[in-house]
Every structure is written in C-alpha cells, then in structure tokens.
C-alpha cells in the first residue's frame, strides 16, 4: 500500500437534506446550495437526448467520445486530436497527474483552491508547493517564483474555487511568458461560462503562443450535467497522445456523450441561464455587507468570516444548505427566492 495515502482522506460529502433536518430540527424544505450545481438544470434538449437513447444502455460507450470530440472541436475551433475527455474534471486531473508525475516531482499551485490538484500529486509521491492566496485570488507573482526547471506541473484555477476570484488576460499572459516552456501550466476554467468580466483571459488565443498552456473545462457547472460527469482538457497533440494511454477505455458513458452534445448545441439556453446567474449574483453585492464578500465571477459567493459555522447554521435555518470553510462560507447562487432569503440573513449577520 502506498504510504503517502496516510496523508490523505477520502472525500467526505455533506449531510443529506433529510439528515440535516433531523440533526437541526428543521421543518420545511431544504435547498442544496453547497456544491455549485446549476439549479436551473441542463438544457431540455439534453434531457431529450438522454430519453432518446435509453435503449442503448446495454452498449459500451464509444471509446474516446468521438462525436463529442468533433462537436467540441468545432465549437472551440481546435483540432480534435488536442482534446481528451474524462468523467468530470476530477478524472482529467487524475489522468494528467498519473501520466506526468513521478516520485519527487514538484507541482506548484495555490492554497485555498480546488483540492484535487494536491490530492492527486500526493498519490503520485510528488511534492506540493502551495502559495498563499492574495486577496482571495491566485498570487501569480509569487507562484512564478516557485516555478523552476524541476517543476512538473503548475495548476491554476480561474475563476478560483472556492473563492470565485479571477486573474485577467494580461496577468496570465505575463505569467506564461516567464514559465519555462517545458513546464505544463494547467488552467482550470470550470466556471468559464459564468464569467462576465471583459478582461478575462482568452486562453485558447494564448495557446497559439504558448504550447505549455493547457485548458480544462467541464459540463458539470453552467451546462448542468454534474450527474453525468463530462470534463475535458485542450492541450497539444503530443500531450493528449500520452495522456490518452492513461484514460480508461470507456470512461465517459454513451448517455453522457449524447447529453453533452445536445447541451453544447443549445447555446441559447446556456446564455439564458448564465444571464440569470449574473443578475442574481449582482444582488448579493448590492448590500453594504458585501464588503465581507470576495468578488465573484462564478455561480457562487464566498463570504469571509471567522464565524463560518454560525453563518452556515443561520443560512440553514432559512432552508439553505451552504458550504462552510475555515475562513468563510461558500454560497451557491440559487433561484431568486432562495437568494433573497440568504441575503436577508447576510444583512443582519455579525461578521
């Protein structure tokens, strides 16, 4: 057994709504606003695609998701050979880590970011350098100081989970200009579709200059397909060819592929959902207490407080399950009624 597993723990999901009701004596409905899911759900066309192909459940998937690869390549205008799919970005991160890292290698990332970068590096006996956040965001200037010839991977999350902050195009371009060209820079854009900032990086454009800039995106967030597990990376042909050796042969299901293609084709629905999210997100930042919130470009708001558990329980009392962290609470943006309830709590909370 790998000894380094003793440094880690299995993922611990939050309590179910029913368990929370019993624990806290809550009556009425509880809304799950803890995992940054898109509460509006997927495009109706994606649901129709699932229904239309239920008779194919006894077939194995087509290995490598060729139909979805073609659809993504046309959508992004990239060569299909540069795309690799996983069962969510969790598996994409796992595959890259397994393919690249050897014992003693170093990865560089940030504290207070998506935990799977760290988790998979430890599994592969790699060293993890985590640079503290700066005002809730990635401190690219100090991250670059930790990158050297021995660095095997750099992980950037933009916008960052769980804080919601982002770095802009010029900042990323400057960073890439200073990273050794052989060091892969993985840019996780899981929340890309929710971004409204005009200076957000055009990572696909930057890939034309930087062969080591690799882009990760998912269908779990804005596309509303978290339960079907589809994520992907856009990298060089050479990298994808090697990483594809690690990929399990049937990792993305047939139904997932059909649903993702249909969701991708319905950009009008996606635009409507993200516009609703932006409108509701703005409501959180209209109250004076928003001085305690980190600026967000996602479908969640991070509230900075030393009383995270108290705030979590206060929000629970109005029917909203959120996610407490040591430095605050992450709130998934929900429907207007849910958001209004939470905003009222936030207006009167003693931070």
From Swiss-Prot:
PANTHER family: HISTIDINOL-PHOSPHATE AMINOTRANSFERASE, HISTIDINOL-PHOSPHATE AMINOTRANSFERASE 2. Keywords: Amino-acid biosynthesis, Aminotransferase, Histidine biosynthesis, Pyridoxal phosphate, Transferase. One of its GO terms (biological process) is L-histidine biosynthetic process. Its cofactor is pyridoxal 5'-phosphate. It is an enzyme of class 2 (transferase). It comes from Staphylococcus haemolyticus (strain JCSC1435). PROSITE patterns: AA_TRANSFER_CLASS_2. The modification N6-(pyridoxal phosphate)lysine is found at residue 221. Belongs to the class-II pyridoxal-phosphate-dependent aminotransferase family. Histidinol-phosphate aminotransferase subfamily. GO terms for molecular function: histidinol-phosphate transaminase activity; pyridoxal phosphate binding. The lineage of its organism: Bacteria, Bacillati, Bacillota, Bacilli, Bacillales. HAMAP family: HisC_aminotrans_2. Its EC number is 2.6.1.9. Homodimer. It catalyses: L-histidinol phosphate + 2-oxoglutarate = 3-(imidazol-4-yl)-2-oxopropyl phosphate + L-glutamate. Pathway: Amino-acid biosynthesis; L-histidine biosynthesis; L-histidine from 5-phospho-alpha-D-ribose 1-diphosphate: step 7/9. This is Histidinol-phosphate aminotransferase.
């Amino acid at each position: 057994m790998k000894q380094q597993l003793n440094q880690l723990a299995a993922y611990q999901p939050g309590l179910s709504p029913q368990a929370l009701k019993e624990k806290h004596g809550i009556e009425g409905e509880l809304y799950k606003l803890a995992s940054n899911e898109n509460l509006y759900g997927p495009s109706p066309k994606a649901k129709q695609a699932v229904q239309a192909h239920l008779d194919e459940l006894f077939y194995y998937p087509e290995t490598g998701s060729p139909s979805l690869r073609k659809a993504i390549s046309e959508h992004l205008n990239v060569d299909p050979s540069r795309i690799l799919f996983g069962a969510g970005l969790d598996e994409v991160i796992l595959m890259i880590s397994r393919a690249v890292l050897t014992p003693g290698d170093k990865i560089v990332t940030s504290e207070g970011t998506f935990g799977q970068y760290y988790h998979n590096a430890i599994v592969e006996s790699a060293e993890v350098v985590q640079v503290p956040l700066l005002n809730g965001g990635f401190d690219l200037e100090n991250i670059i100081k930790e990158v050297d010839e021995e660095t095997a991977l750099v992980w950037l999350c933009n916008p960052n989970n769980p804080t919601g902050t982002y770095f802009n195009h010029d900042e990323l371009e400057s960073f890439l200009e200073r990273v050794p060209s052989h060091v892969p820079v993985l840019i996780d854009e899981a929340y890309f579709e929710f971004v409204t900032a005009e200076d957000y990086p055009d990572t696909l454009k930057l890939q034309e200059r930087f062969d080591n800039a690799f882009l990760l995106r998912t269908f779990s967030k804005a596309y509303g397909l978290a339960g079907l597990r589809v994520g992907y990376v856009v990298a060089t042909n050479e990298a994808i060819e090697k990483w594809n050796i690690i990929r399990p042969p049937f990792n993305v299901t047939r139904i997932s592929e059909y649903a993702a293609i249909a969701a991708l084709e319905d950009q009008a629905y996606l635009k409507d959902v993200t516009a609703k999210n932006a409108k509701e997100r703005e409501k959180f930042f209209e109250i004076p207490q928003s001085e305690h919130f980190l600026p967000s470009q996602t479908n969640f708001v991070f509230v900075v407080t030393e009383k995270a558990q108290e705030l979590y329980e206060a929000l629970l009392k109005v029917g909203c399950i959120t996610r407490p962290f040591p430095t605050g609470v992450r709130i998934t943006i929900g429907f207007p009624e849910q958001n209004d309830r939470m905003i009222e709590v936030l207006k009167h909370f003693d931070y």
